[in-house]
Amino acid sequence: MKVLLIQDVEHLGTAGDIKEVSGGYGRNYLLPKKLAVFATPGLIKQAEERLAKQRKLEAKQREELRGLADSINGVTLKFVTKVGEQDRLYGSVTSSDIAEKLQAAIGQEVDRRKIQLDEPIKRTGVYSIGVRLLAGLEPHINVVVEGENGEGSVQPAAEAAEVASTEA
């Protein structure tokens, strides 16, 4: 029996998929729980058209994101903040701060959740941070954090992490 899934069904498929299932499974489980409907030729045709349209839309979005990745890759953002002892910042630089500066730099909005920052930056230095747009599409930006009036030494992120681990 062919059915068109209305909702995602674990171990079977996602909504919109057309699946071949046993008659008992379809009649006794999928149909009564409104998880699927009989796959008539008209429904199959509609599902295929919807799937083709969805693939076309995804391809277009992927191309737009590739263009965005090209504009993001290698951008350097500079943050100037107050610095205390041992190059520690008063406050921190968060993914939201980076997203705002990145939007100002490239003119397009980037969701802060896509910025791969494990924890806020709390020391001066140069950091390389990934922006995950899609699986396999992750451009990197450089973030430079300096103290006001040239306070604090700007060192690569690896050295900053090493200094932080020795002090902890």
UniProtKB/Swiss-Prot annotation:
Residues 157-168 have a biased composition (Low complexity). Residues 148-168 are annotated as: Disordered. One of its GO terms (molecular function) is structural constituent of ribosome. One of its GO terms (biological process) is translation. GO terms for cellular component: ribonucleoprotein complex; ribosome. Pfam families: Ribosomal_L9_C (PF03948), Ribosomal_L9_N (PF01281). InterPro entries: Ribosomal_bL9, Ribosomal_bL9/RNase_H1_N, Ribosomal_bL9_bac/chp, Ribosomal_bL9_C, Ribosomal_bL9_C_sf, Ribosomal_bL9_N, Ribosomal_bL9_N_sf. Belongs to the bacterial ribosomal protein bL9 family. Binds to the 23S rRNA. This is Large ribosomal subunit protein bL9. It comes from Herpetosiphon aurantiacus (strain ATCC 23779 / DSM 785 / 114-95). The gene is rplI.
